[in-house]
Structure formats: C-alpha cells, structure tokens
Amino acid sequence: MSEIGERVKKIVVEHLGVEPEKVVETASFIDDLGADSLDTVELVMAFEEEFGCEIPDDAAETILTVGDATKFLEKNAKS
C-alpha cells in the first residue's frame, strides 16, 4: 500500500473502529467495514482535512472502497 494508502487506512481504522487487517484496497466502506451514510460523510471530511483537498459531492459519491479513496487522493492530495 502506498504512503497515501497507509494514511487512508489509518483514518478508516480510527473512524470506523475496524481491525487494520480488514482495511484492504477492495474493502467497501459500507458492505465490508460496516459504515453507514453518516460514517461515509465523516470519512470524506477526514480525508479532506488530512490531505488538504476538497472532495466534491459528485466525487465523494464514487468513493465506495478504500482503493477508490486512495486513487482519488493520490491524484488530488495537496499534502
């Protein structure tokens, strides 16, 4: 996992309280990690804060897995 991927993983573990080994690229926030819609909004906000970028609503709707978040942030992160 990339450095950004590791940071994404850390945020997911902290916000969802899941075991780190469950946070893999293909893990769905809702189906695999037990997030609800509020959790996903909070994750997006945490990603924005951690990486210094804005995630527009239309982009946020496409971030369904850990891998989706990592790919988006690798392209758009400022820090």
UniProtKB/Swiss-Prot annotation:
<dbReference type="InterPro" id="IPR006162">
    <property type="entry name" value="Ppantetheine_attach_site"/>
</dbReference>
<keyword id="KW-0596">Phosphopantetheine</keyword>
<dbReference type="GO" id="GO:0000036">
    <property type="term" value="F:acyl carrier activity"/>
</dbReference>
<keyword id="KW-0963">Cytoplasm</keyword>
<dbReference type="InterPro" id="IPR003231">
    <property type="entry name" value="ACP"/>
</dbReference>
<keyword id="KW-0443">Lipid metabolism</keyword>
<dbReference type="Pfam" id="PF00550">
    <property type="entry name" value="PP-binding"/>
</dbReference>
<dbReference type="GO" id="GO:0000035">
    <property type="term" value="F:acyl binding"/>
</dbReference>
<comment type="similarity">
    <text>Belongs to the acyl carrier protein (ACP) family.</text>
</comment>
<dbReference type="GO" id="GO:0016020">
    <property type="term" value="C:membrane"/>
</dbReference>
<dbReference type="InterPro" id="IPR036736">
    <property type="entry name" value="ACP-like_sf"/>
</dbReference>
<dbReference type="GO" id="GO:0005829">
    <property type="term" value="C:cytosol"/>
</dbReference>
<dbReference type="InterPro" id="IPR009081">
    <property type="entry name" value="PP-bd_ACP"/>
</dbReference>
<feature type="domain" description="Carrier">
    <location>
        <begin position="2"/>
        <end position="77"/>
    </location>
</feature>
<keyword id="KW-0597">Phosphoprotein</keyword>
<dbReference type="GO" id="GO:0009245">
    <property type="term" value="P:lipid A biosynthetic process"/>
</dbReference>
<protein>
    <recommendedName>
        <fullName>Acyl carrier protein</fullName>
    </recommendedName>
</protein>
<keyword id="KW-0444">Lipid biosynthesis</keyword>
<comment type="function">
    <text>Carrier of the growing fatty acid chain in fatty acid biosynthesis.</text>
</comment>
<feature type="modified residue" description="O-(pantetheine 4'-phosphoryl)serine">
    <location>
        <position position="37"/>
    </location>
</feature>
<comment type="pathway">
    <text>Lipid metabolism; fatty acid biosynthesis.</text>
</comment>
<keyword id="KW-0275">Fatty acid biosynthesis</keyword>
<keyword id="KW-0276">Fatty acid metabolism</keyword>
